[in-house]
Amino acid sequence: MLKRLSMNEFPQDIFTEPQGYSVNTLENLGPLTGMAGIWEGIRGMDVKPKAQGPKQQAYVERIELQPIDPQTNGPQLFYGLRYHAHITKPDQVKMYHDQVGYWLWEPANDNLIHTLTIPRGMITMAAGKAKASDKQFELHAKEGDCDAGISSNPFLNYAFRTVEFHIQVSIHDDGTWSYEQDTVMKIKCQEALFHHVDSNTLHKIEEATPNPQARL
């Protein structure tokens, strides 16, 4: 998780933005560098909840991660990727899962942020730490956490409430990357928590487009 800073650990000057930083996002993504581009994964596996119990489902994924211009919050500076993941079952056209959001890295303190929004009425912001050279990292979110939390529509909270979210990303030497994701759910009338697990390995099919400022 992101380290919680006390008020006296934040800078007193909350308005002055950093100066002289590079505007080339692709050169400053740190641990996210190996994820930039357009990717395809054909061997995804999903373990999802059904009335009869857990069910395994294979899936095919296309995910596009494009660099954005550097973002500042006063003195805070992020480099990041905007992404769109589109998932279908093998040999089908119908959408199985769709997800948009951002991957962000803060070089000053190695903070990582992963935001995700899905069209079931759910959003999550997961957080973690990674140094620029790290090839594996984890991010986490938890229900009720104001820094790295989860918000769902009323029906999902009633029937399939997400209480935790975890993702581990691995950047591989062969140019691929993979993830293992665990969405921990409290399902109505079930005592034990359910681990909705997803995993896939992504192969690059197209390079990323430089961010707008870097193209000037």
Predicted regions mapped to residue ranges:
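Amphipathic/hydrophobic helical signal segments and adjacent flexible N-terminal regions
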Residues: M1-G80, H86, P90, V163-E164, ...
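Exposed beta-sheet edge/beta-hairpin loop segments within beta-rich domains
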Residues: G30-L32, F155-R161, F165-D173
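Short hydrophobic/aromatic-rich beta-strand segments that constitute the beta-sheet cores
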Residues: G41, Y83-A85, L112-L116, E138-A141, ...
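Transmembrane beta-barrel outer-membrane domains
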Residues: Q56, K94, Y158-F160
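Well-ordered beta-strand positions in beta-sheet-rich domains
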Residues: R62, D98-Y102, M125-A127, H166, ...
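Hydrophobic/aromatic-rich structural module bridging two neighboring secondary-structure elements via a short loop
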Residues: P70-H114
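A short, structured loop/turn motif at beta-sheet edges
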Residues: N73-G74, W105-D110, G128-F137, V169-W177, ...
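An exposed acidic His-Trp-rich patch
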Residues: V100, P107-N157
